[in-house]
Amino acid sequence: MDYDTIIGLEIHAELKTKSKMFCSCNNDAQGKEPNTTVCPICMAHPGTLPVPNKQAIEWTILIGLALNCKINELSKFDRKNYFYPDLPKGYQISQYDLPIAYDGFLEVDDKPVLITRIHLEEDTGKLIHPVGKKHSLVDYNRAGTPLVELVTEPVISDAKTAKKFAQSYQQILRFLNISNADMEKGELRCEANISVQEKNKWKYTNGQILPVGKYKLNPKVELKNINSFKYLEKAIDYEVKRQIKALKDGEKLVQETRGWNNGKGITFSQRFKETSADYRYFPEPDIPPLKISQKWIDEIKCHMSELPAQKTKRFMEEYFFTDKEAEILAGDKDLAKFTEQVMCELHSWISASGDTFERQKHKLAKATANWLINELFKHLKAKGKSAARIYPVKSGEAGILPKAKLFDRVKITPENFAEFITLVYQDKINSSAAQTILAQMIKKGGDPTNIMAELGLEQLDDQAALEKIIAEVILKNQKQVAEYKAGKTNVLQFLVGQTMAATGGKANPKVVIEILKNLLDK
């Protein structure tokens, strides 16, 4: 029996506003002593009243616009009632039937993943479980942090697409500069709702999974406790296989919440899954409904920066990067800015040399992408300063996308990197010398031309000087010369290597090969 996989995502993202959602407490609780960024409002003292954070509302509208959503003209906050120690009020201020944004989509691999809603709520506190103790502690510093929840339609059919969607959403949040969206710090939390249904026994209509005929739908399972994109994909894959195996073994599935165990690579049951009725939603009586005018929406739209997908497309059209190169270089806000600054500086360098930038732009962009993706990041990885994600660039190659803010910690400026690319492009240094210079630039910064001069790495391409050196190489390697003349042409590389060694690696390989062929073919 064959099954279809049905996946919907719920993604929570903390907004990095200066103050919390409904009070004036500092919203940055990272590294703070427990329960020090709290006040009577976020601790739910009797008689206190919440005041909504305008910036959090505007940023939620901005997310909605970035994800092609409709914005509700009338929105409101609701009370979500449940008891848990990390919830000081005994309820959470959230949104139920009138979210700020709804009915949107985000393209993944050129296919739209539909978005049901994007709503705004307050975060809870954090439970701490001391090792070896029989009690738990609670830190309310996080309570009241603005939290945006995105809910997709159940239209995702595989774990890889779910992971790509979450990664793309993280990119957008960072490009908009409204959330750090760091999963390791809990600033971005992904939950997956998963069910498996027999093929041709169900249909998707108006946002609902419905049975065909007398078929009884299998229940969905919610996955929690997932702290990385890698584990999101693994957890979904495992859970799909678990459910299919259970059904084939004649077991009955239940609607439940399951956690993910990174160490064991399995999901485990936590509790039976609640329904919306269990939360007894009702309108928040202390906060009036939100009226969102078109004028307000238009003002917010004016502040929306270029998004990753748009920047990727522009990089391909403007600089002739390949789709994979553009995806990598435009995939991080700081890296994209660095790349554009380098291309701008290259325009100045090439124009100053008397050449035409437009004529050389394609080749310069290729060199820039190669040295950024395949060389600079390789050096940084070796120094332990990178490695967030690995993308294939060409067959057999990989580019490493650095973590956010990487270029704040690297001493290379766009101006110096553009000068470095110019030296390579104009054959003033060979590949070996370029690697040495780049390593020095990463370590100490500085002008690549000065580094080249200090280390004596300028490429030797003087015809007369090289002919003299190559003549000596030929004289000392008569056996290889005879092999070459007998038709064993790959020996030429040996002779090139001998010449490079004789010049301390400074010779221009192209000129060396040309001279060798001229002398050997006489």
Residue ranges of predicted features:
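Extended, non-catalytic structural segments that build the interaction scaffolds
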Residues: I297-H303, Q310, V342, F417-I429
